């Protein structure tokens, strides 16, 4: 059975305004009778043992599984800056191992000006291999999050290529339903409208068999149903590959609706799917 988790970034604006803490976000997940939480690395107040234990116990006492730590890296950088990105991933793999969290989210590369996807690709593969090998040594899976906004991999084919090029059992795939090229939620083209040049539902189909976690993106939920993404089309794709794992609710419609109103609506909608 697919299980629902709350991505802590659903409360991005509330958190940034100092009106909620990660521990209080965990309380919200329990209040909405969700099954787990995804914890963004910027929401940790500390990496001291006492604080990490407090977070772990808060989830345990509320019956919530800690699905993954989301880290925002960029393997498109070079030199010392690239080494810093690799070290950032290793730091949070260590945190995950200390907390018993099975996975850490990774991005690919934001391709620098003057480079092509192909010229940046070998650097992406080599950096990711280092991180995946480190994850393997710690017993923590590194989950590739497909992303657009100038980032690769941005298509289903690119995701499969990178997974195969890295070729490590501790390197897997976190499928984001709204972040493939052509999605109404991406930055290229007119936001809110599907780009017909790209078959983003096809990208979801391509990478779904490799997914160990799905991020269900929510952009417009004021009506009680997601308006930009067609979940009547997406959910059969996910279910038909036998997916039986975790699905995060990830709200990114703060320009339309406030987070305290939107998150319970998104939870109810995804449960209806």
List PLM regions with ranges.
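A short helix->loop->beta-strand "cap" motif at the edges of active sites that frequently abuts
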Residues: 64, 101-102, 140, 241-245
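Active-site cleft segment of glycoside hydrolase catalytic domains centered on the general acid/base Glu
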Residues: 114-128
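Active-site-proximal loop/turn and secondary-structure-junction residues that shape catalytic pockets
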Residues: 10-12, 41-43, 72-75, 108-112, ...
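Short acidic/histidine-rich active-site segments
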Residues: 246-254
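N-terminal pre-domain/capping segments
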Residues: 1-103, 119, 129, 136, ...
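Conserved, mostly hydrophobic/aromatic
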Residues: 6, 29, 37, 59, ...
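Acidic/histidine-rich catalytic cores of soluble enzymes
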Residues: 36-37, 69, 130-236
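Active-site groove signature of glycoside hydrolases
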Residues: 96-117, 138-148
